[in-house]
Amino acid sequence: MVEACWDDNNNKWRTLIKRFGQEKEMGEDYTVTSDFLVSAVGQLNTPKYPQITGLEAFEGKTMHSARWDWDYNIQGKRVGIIGTGATAAQIIPEIAQHTSQLTVFQRTPAWVMPRHDKPISKTRQAMYRYVPFARRRYRAKLMDFRESVFEASVLPQSARHSHIANVSRSHMLTQLPSCASTKLRAALTPKYPFSCKRIIVSDDFYPTLLHDNVKLETSPISEVTPTGIKMADGTHHDLDLLILATGFRATEFLNTIRLYGTGGQSLSDTWAKGASAYLGMTVENFPNFGILYGPNTNLAYNSEILQIEAQSLYVTRLISAVLTQKRQGNTLRIQPKPEVVANYNDEIQSRLSQSTFADPGCTSWFKDEHGRITTNWCGSAVEYQKRTCYLDWSDYVILGSGAKEVEKRGVERWRRRVEETWVSDRMLGICAAAAVMAAITGWVAWAH
């Protein structure tokens, strides 16, 4: 997919599909016509390649972590990996056991939290299988914990913010305890506030850096040579494979696709000062268009699936309205009012400005080139679910022969998917105790 244009005359989207490589053998380029268009490419889809002198001159194997070559055998190879973010923290422990030498090139250290991975005992597995309530309760408690991390990690004024940062520091001391690790700990200690960049959750990243065949390199990279990487201090690392764990062009939403809305207005022009959308899903002047995992919907502390599920339910209502009117022989064109989009984004930007993400001393993929936070959501996952479990039709410009019928609906509501606990442990205990007392009282009465 390379281009999508809204046809004002026919109230349709026309999407151009180009065939590349072997797909050319299947036929020519073609156009798909639709009543509604949904972008489900998300935020993390286009690899970001580092601007390093000589990168293209490297004669060994180079691959971005998001474009992994599974046919390449790393066994016994001298491997370099650029980056120590979330992707690198997952790759490094896995490949270190197969390489003859692994050099980790770090520009900025990351805050690392413990994952606490451990096997679930057979007893607990049986309990979760045969006592569904116990399984659901455990899952809900996990959700409660993840939601509690929001305030502690994202809001610097929170009483728990310094505590959770200390948990990360203790995790490092636990995993790198020896005096010999003093220099390594210093190199891995962040000099920026906790949570202003993406936090790594790992139990095996730090220990892997202690392996004899693993070296952490913190000197700036000078250039890539045909045989490896030369550092600013003159050191040269010979490599067979160079892995680029350098992330994605996260703030450049839909950057590989040309989108044109009403009057031929391009999405790139609309978002010239930063991507924004109403509830992260709909954009002014782009009718019958929805986005999943769009601007300001990323969660830095909980599962993104929660957001995408909420968005899917919302966008489905928009699609349903368009298709229902089409079946009745009517046309329908839905787009958010500009003032609604503006007010919504003013609110979330105001809240985000008070978060750790906005720290001026911190650069991250959460911010665009202007310093505006365009990726992250400003609240908890539950708050977002509650804000997207209803559709207020007055928020939208509705045109077409079916417009009046849709406008009369007012506000449509649906039940959100509740993942958190409904009742506290204390209340459960009181209810259980009351049930036991009632049972005993009943038994005594029956016995007499």
Language model features: what each stretch is:
Residues E23-F36, N73-K77, A232-L241, A245:
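Core beta-strand elements of the Rossmann-like FAD/NAD(P) dinucleotide-binding domain
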Residues M1-Q43:
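Feature captures the FAD/FMN-dependent oxidoreductase FAD-binding
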Residues R14-L16, K183-I200:
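Helix-loop-beta segment of a Rossmann-like dinucleotide-binding subdomain
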Residues L37-A180, V214, H237, S266, ...:
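Rossmann-like dinucleotide-binding core of oxidoreductases
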Residues I52-T62, T227-G280:
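Central helical "cap/lid" subdomain
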Residues M1-R14, D71, D212-A232:
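A conserved short coil-to-beta-strand element within the FAD-binding core of flavoproteins
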Residues W111-P114, A126, P132-F133, R139-D144, ...:
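C-terminal, flexible cofactor-proximal segment of oxidoreductases
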